[in-house]
Amino acid sequence: PTNGIYCDRSGATAPYAPETTTNLGLDYSRDLGNGMVIDANLNVDTSSKYFITTNLDKNIDQGGYTKYGAQIGLGSDDGKWRLSVIGDNLTDERIRVIGGTIPLARTFVQLASGGALDGIAYDAIYARPRNVTVKFDYNF
């Protein structure tokens, strides 16, 4: 360290901070009569590329993505009950949440290859893949 400064990140991109993000949501609701209501919504989330490691490793960043979600529901107009189908990440985007190098992986690679350094191993944790759920609410 020089003058107590361990790492100077001046001008560097912050980890986990995309340059742009957007969210668009559309909601629709309609009274069907006979005490029934139908509603639906669609949401779109976008993100530009961002780093998922604190050391800003370009080998394991998250590229830009667009993620879609939707919901449709049918229920009573008094809110007593509601049946919904909910979908998230409908286009099944693979979104890295966090990642980095695997500790000691370089050492194991060296040992397995007879001493030659073949590279660095990376791992990542991903957000949930496409999922669709059915939900029933009943208020007593």
Language-model features: locations:
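C-terminal beta-signal and adjacent terminal beta-strands/loops
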Residues: V44-T53, L74-F140
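C-terminal extracellular loops and terminal segments
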Residues: P1-G69, Y126-R128
